[in-house]
Amino acid sequence: MEEKDESEQSISAGRQEIRKRRRPSQPMVDKSQQTEVTEKKKQLSIPQSSGPKAALSIGNIPGSKLNYECHRVSSQLQQTWIKRKRVQDMADKSLQTETIAEEKKEEIKLVCEAVVPEEKPAAVEVGPEFPESVREVEVPPNRYSVQVKIDRSQQTTCTGDWTMMNFPQKEKLDKEQQTYFSESEIVVIGWPTNSFSKSKEGAQKRKSSGNIFLSEHPEFQPTTSSNEEIRRPSISRTVSISPTKKDSPVPLEDEKDVPVEVQPPAAEEISAEEQLPLAETTSEEVPVAVQPPPAEEPPLEAQPSPTEEAPGDEAPAKVEPTPAEEALSEKPPAEEALVEIQPSPVEEAAGDEAPAKVEATSSEETLLKEPLTEVQPPAAEEAPIQDTPELQLSPAVEAPAEEAPAEAEPPPAEEAPAEEAPEVQSPPAEEAPAEEPPEIQSPPAEEAPAEEPPEVQSPPAEEAPAEEAPEVQSPPAEEAPAEEPPEVQSPPAEEVPAGEPPEVQSPPAEEAPAEEAPEVQSPPAEEVPAEEALAEVEPPPAEEAPAGEPSEVQSPPAEEAPAEEAPEVQSPPSEEAPAEEAPEVQSVPAGQAPAEEPLEVQPPPAEDATEEEASEVQSLPTDEAPAEEGLGFQSPPADKAPEEEAPEVQSPPAEEAPAEEPPEVQSLPADEAPAEEATEEVQSPPTEESPAEEAPAELQPPSTEETTSEMVSVEKQPSLTEEPFITPISLEETSAEVLLPPFEQTPADEALVENVSPVDQAPKEADVLVEKLESGNLDDKPKSEEPLERDTIPKDSSGTKNEGVSFEIKGVIHIELE
């Protein structure tokens, strides 16, 4: 036991000792460790408490305990101060972080410089204030600067700059886009704001106007920005605004053409006029031009022409002047017509075209018309027509060319002046100036009144449509020249000659139509384009009316697009109205039925649209009545014309729109037609192009063409009606003219239309026309051939352009829709 105890005790003793040793040792160890830890902790805590200071203090450590302690103290003070400051600044972390870096720097400095550490101790001794102050002085500045820098860099980079930059950029982008849209929208809004479609166009013109300048030679540029540019060109066309147009457009809208155009016409006209027509044109043109519409149109046309015309029309017609002149030239050639129509330069272009066309046509038609007028000696006319058709066709197709040709031709024949003036004038002049007076003159009178100026002018306005209409109408105008005498004339003539016009128209129309129809038809193809243009034009009218009516017509146009679509749609309307007309037209349509149908439809639509539109817009009725009255049949044409006009206008609009977008609906049709037309028209110089397009149109249009032809016929008919149409045209015209698309259309259209017009007229003659159209249309009949021939040319010439143009136009159309 003892041993055990001892052992235990020993063990225990040993254990106890060990334990004791351990205990004391442990406590010692613990203390030492603890102490060390404590010191470390203190150090760490202090630095840690310093936070940033930790590093600094560490940095100081190399310097010396003094520095370290002093610094540490200072850091504590600083830290406290910093905390206060942080709280105040609320920049805790950033400040702290910066502070740490700065403090490190300071520490380094302190370490490096004993003085600094000493100072700090002194500072410490002095009190927190000194370090604080020191710190403030040194650190804060650095810190602030650093912080500022950091903050700025961070904020600026991330927050401030990005935000600001982004915002501005975003704003800019948004604004640009928005603005861009706004402009468009505004423009759109503007359209409503302006007056009717025209207003739109005016607005559009304005909108485009800047662009339009570009557009001014959109023909070239449209390609550039097919959509906008084209649209603008279209717009320009539509606007007719060549920049000048812009004003013009406004006036156009207001005046519809007269004032507006006047200027351009003058200038342009002058150019055109310059051209020969110059004097004459000037006169006439002026009259017509006066009717600025024409002028405007010139602008319109010019521009459009340039664009469009330039493209085809102008090229041909304008060909001469095309580009530069284009407006001028355009006008000049067109101008001639243009000039005289120049009044509707656009129109002119269109008109020009119309005039030219008309002129050409006119010449041609004049020939034709002359014949018409003559057809007023139909026979002569016929010959001329055919001749003209041919011419015309050429004119039509050629119209551009012809225009040039016509122009040239007429110039020769008419001598540009004659033609030109004749054309418009010529028709008048040629037309027998009497006619011209009647026609142009009369038209001027009337025309001025209704037709040519109207037509042209109106056409201008309308003319684009009218012109188109002119063309259609112009054709009417033109035709009207031809017809115009009849139509315009017709209105005059028609009015008086209504019979005759019908007759004239009829024969001419018929013949011309037939022929022309063929031609038209050919043109149909061409004309289709023309027609299409017409249709398109019609759409323009439709559209334009639609423009005013656009929807309506446009719808029709859209529908019309269908119609000629447009035609057709229009047709429906036409049909509707034209049902009656349709018959007639339809009749023609009947013959032409298929194509015609659209035609018919279209005319009806045109009529309808037009009518409504025209009526609506126009007083189509009135017009129509007259037209109808004169045309009677034509009334439908009137309707149609109006409609057509509307369509045409619409088309222009449509085209424009179409060409532009709206037309697009219309455009569709219009576009299609317009596009086509635009294309065609644009193309028409495009017309010519139209031919191509036309070809397409023709192809396409074959029916379309037919339709178009028909349409054209019908439309043309409306052209006949055109007079009424014109009236509408005036309104519409402005639009259309403004639309220019008509213009656009006009070129080809016009020629075509013109051709068609005859056809249209034919519609009066519908039967004959139908037969002829049908034959012609389908066959393109001799005329067709001729026209075709020309058509072909246009097709090729214009075709190429046409396609290009078409694309552009289409693009434009899309844009337009936007």
From Swiss-Prot:
GO terms for molecular function: calcium ion binding. Keywords: Calcium, Cell projection, Cilium, Flagellum, Phosphoprotein. Signal peptide: none annotated. The modification Phosphoserine is found at S25, S57, S182. It is found in: Cell projection, Cilium, Flagellum. Residues 773-794 have a biased composition (Basic and acidic residues). Coiled coil: none annotated. Residues 1-61, 195-727, 773-805 are annotated as: Disordered. May be involved in the later stages of fibrous sheath biogenesis and spermatozoa capacitation. Inhibits ROPN1 and ROPN1L SUMOylation. Binds calcium. This is Fibrous sheath CABYR-binding protein. It comes from Bos taurus. The gene is FSCB.
